[in-house]
Amino acid sequence: DSFVKNKFVYITPYLDEVDRLKEICDNNEVKVWIPTTKNLKGSKLESIKQALQNNASVIATHELFSRLDKECLEYLNNHNYTLYLDEVHEVVKVYEDMSSCDFKLLLNDKVIKIDEITGRVNWIKEDLYIGRFNDFKILCELGVIYSLGNSIIIWTFPIEIFNSFNEIFIMTYLFEAQLQASYYKMYSIKYKYSSIFGAKGKYVLTSFNKTQYI
């Protein structure tokens, strides 16, 4: 019932699962927005921005969820969304869209600077920039790029995105063994376990049953 009544963002690993969930929602008269490239920018990210701006429920993939930016964050903060994650999200990974040579070039030209304590990469050049490093600039401004040894570049999912949701439900198992559990602990995000009970085609959350966890 809460899935129907509340605005939600449902994130799934697979594109074909998006279509399957859309069909289920249609059959139950639940209106959802599926991001497409049918907009002026030809971008699914632009499409999900339109959905959030219009207070619509959304079904999308983990890949698209990873690309949410400050504009998406603003819309999420202004509306009361619930997040459903089908499996854990990739919250930390090596950033491979920039070569070490280009990274050193930006460092030497004083376009970026690495925080000596945290390792966070900051975009410090104040001039208006539009070029091949624009995506990297946006990530630096989000505060999600870190450097190890001035060469290895690490991307982290912006914790502000998770904090913008009223509630988050993660559908997975052995969560404590997942990187996202450590990520939540690092940011002092509290969570609790629940079990799922199913009967007559309906499923409800119940108190956590440890025997199901083993």
Language-model regions, residue ranges each:
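Conserved interdomain hinge at the start of the Helicase C-terminal
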Residues: 1-3, 159-161, 214
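Conserved Walker A/P-loop ATP-binding site and its immediately adjacent core
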Residues: 3-29, 36-37, 63-64
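A general structural motif
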Residues: 5-7, 29, 54-55, 78-80, ...
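Short, charged/polar "capping" segments at the starts of alpha-helices
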Residues: 16-21, 42, 177-179
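Inter-Walker segment of RecA-like/P-loop motor cores
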Residues: 28-67
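Signature of the SF2 helicase/ATPase Hel1-core->accessory helical subdomain module
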Residues: 62-191
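Interdomain hinge/linker at the junction between the two RecA-like core domains of SF2 helicases
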Residues: 177-214
